[in-house]
Amino acid sequence: MSRVGKKPVPVPAGVTATVTGQTVKMKGSKGELSFVVPALVNVAMKDGAIEVQPVNQSKPARSLWGTSRAQIANIAEGVSKGFEKKLEITGVGYRAAMAGKALKLSLGYSHDIEYAIPAGITIATPKPTEITISGINRQQVGQVAAEIREYRGPEPYKGKGVKYAGEFIFRKEGKKK
């Protein structure tokens, strides 16, 4: 029995939700998102909340039950509040700046990296060593943050590189003589 799936998804104030067949659409102050629920899961609107139930008690249906509920909850939060991820850049000469519709990263390579910002994502650089990624789609915000971090992930010896804000980097000691 899925503990996540059992709880209905409350529709936040200021958000309109519609359920047509297997599609859940939500519209809020930040934008509009939709999610197609897998066929192994039933979805219905009851008392201002969205309820998710598995079609049967098979393993795949029960697996998708909690996942579908979490996806719908993320859509509800995204269209009302939005999502944000912060990245920190550590290292001498490592910096980030906005260049039109792209993010320009100087990460110690012989060339600068131009990252094209996808639609639906807003990137800001309050400081040259900070990047703020925001949007309404949680998966997309996390994916963009992971792609930027991948260009120069934090290394364990000096801690240089791009890391998530608040991320702990396991440090190693250099070799001894």
From Swiss-Prot:
**Which key words tag this protein in UniProt?**
Ribonucleoprotein, Ribosomal protein, RNA-binding, rRNA-binding
Q: Which GO terms describe its biological process?
A: cytoplasmic translation
Q: What is the top-level taxon of the source organism?
A: Bacteria
Citing just one GO molecular function, the answer is: structural constituent of ribosome
The record, for SUPFAM superfamilies, names: Ribosomal protein L6 (SSF56053)
Q: Has keyword Cell membrane?
A: no
One Pfam family, short name:
Ribosomal_L6
Question: Does the record carry Ribosomal protein as a key word?
Answer: yes
Cite the PANTHER family for this sequence. Answer: 60S/50S RIBOSOMAL PROTEIN L6/L9 (PTHR11655), LARGE RIBOSOMAL SUBUNIT PROTEIN UL6M (PTHR11655:SF14)
Q: What NCBIfam families would the database entry show? A: L6_bact
Q: What does this protein do?
A: This protein binds to the 23S rRNA, and is important in its secondary structure. It is located near the subunit interface in the base of the L7/L12 stalk, and near the tRNA binding site of the peptidyltransferase center.
Q: How does it assemble?
A: Part of the 50S ribosomal subunit.
Name used for this protein in its record: Large ribosomal subunit protein uL6
- Write the lineage as a comma-separated list: Bacteria, Pseudomonadati, Pseudomonadota, Alphaproteobacteria, Hyphomicrobiales
- Please name the gene that encodes this protein: rplF
